[in-house]
A protein has these predicted regions:
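Active-site glycine-rich loops that stabilize anionic/oxyanionic intermediates
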Residues: 26-29, 36-41, 103
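The serine-hydrolase catalytic nucleophile loop
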Residues: 38-50
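Short beta-strand/loop motif that positions the catalytic acidic residue
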Residues: 235, 241-243, 247
Length: 301
């Protein structure tokens, strides 16, 4: 079965909401939950399907709140996202698991790791959005980052118009959408998105993510702009951050603030890489999570 043949799945949560997800890799393998960026969907991580199948990893990709098949709660409190992931892991029969988040999915991964301490084996943050408000970084941000992360969240109508327009572009003029996506990006990101296979996967994930409308991006931007509401120091699992030195999409200072607040967190800087580096190096994160989880279980490769 290739990545495009992996079936969509749905879970009815205790409060009646639907949670959509896919399981890539080896479904009976070691569980790794990976949370997509902003916007995005369960399809975003499909490029790691073959790598995870080879490792024996069950790569569990949920749609986050308001994206794809997943309905958002009426009151979106970041720490409460851990309850949804606990329900998903219970449904799939996994007592313990690894968690990862890319870009806008990173705060949600942090919430899961901080709130489900006894269940999380390891946590990975890929090109992450960091705790901008907690770290008091607003005044030091670039103009573009200040607008995206502190100003835009105050205007949900503008967010709706922007993401509706972007989805229209994805569907009608995908080349223009790809150029828009990387208008401020590092040259290496522009080279990646110019590849037909990467563009198809990334834009397809965005299109699916916005199928329910723009509630997902509205929630994300609101969460990014305010304190996260939990103590990152509660994370006890091995943690690692990867960030490209040429990444222009997320504030680098917030990435380091995230790592500094998590005990013993390792930072891997990739000097020549941009925001999308994991697309081209899709084995790095699953291999690390797999190795850490096996070590925690006392298993040798």
């Amino acid at each position: 079965m290739n990545a495009d043949q992996v079936p969509d799945q749905r879970l009815r949560l205790p409060d009646g909401r639907t949670l959509g997800f896919c399981v890539y890799g080896e479904p009976a393998g070691m569980p790794v939950v990976f949370l997509h960026g902003t916007p995005g969907s369960r399809y975003q991580i499909a490029f790691a399907h073959e790598v995870c199948r080879g490792l024996g990893v069950a790569l569990i990709a949920p749609d986050r709140w308001g994206y794809g098949l997943s309905e958002a709660p009426s009151d979106a409190i970041l720490g409460a996202y851990a309850d949804d992931m606990a329900a998903l892991m219970d449904h799939l029969g996994h007592a313990r698991f690894c968690i990862g988040g890319v870009s806008g999915g990173a705060p949600y991964a942090a919430a899961v790791a901080a709130c489900l301490v006894s269940r999380v084996l390891a946590v990975a943050f890929v090109s992450p959005v960091g705790p901008i408000a907690d770290a008091g970084l607003g005044p030091s941000l670039s103009l573009a980052h200040r607008f995206n992360f502190t100003v835009l969240p105050r205007y949900p109508g503008v967010v709706t118009a922007a993401f509706r327009g972007f989805r229209w572009s994805v569907r009608r003029t995908p080349r223009m959408a790809a150029r828009l996506l990387t208008s401020r990006a590092a040259p290496i990101d522009k080279q990646l998105i110019a590849r037909a296979d990467v563009s198809r996967r990334v834009l397809g994930s965005f299109d699916e993510g916005l199928r329910l409308g723009t509630r997902g991006p509205q929630i994300d931007l609101s969460i990014f702009s305010r304190p996260w509401g939990f103590d990152l120091a509660r994370i006890s699992a091995p943690a690692r951050v990867w960030i490209g030195g040429a990444d222009r999409d997320v504030p680098i200072a917030a990435v380091h603030a995230l790592a500094a607040r998590i005990p013993h967190c390792v930072v891997t800087e990739l000097p020549e890489e941009g925001h999308l580096w994991v697309v081209a190096h899709n084995a790095d994160v699953p291999e690390w999570l797999h190795a850490v989880a096996r070590a925690s279980a006392g298993l040798a490769d």
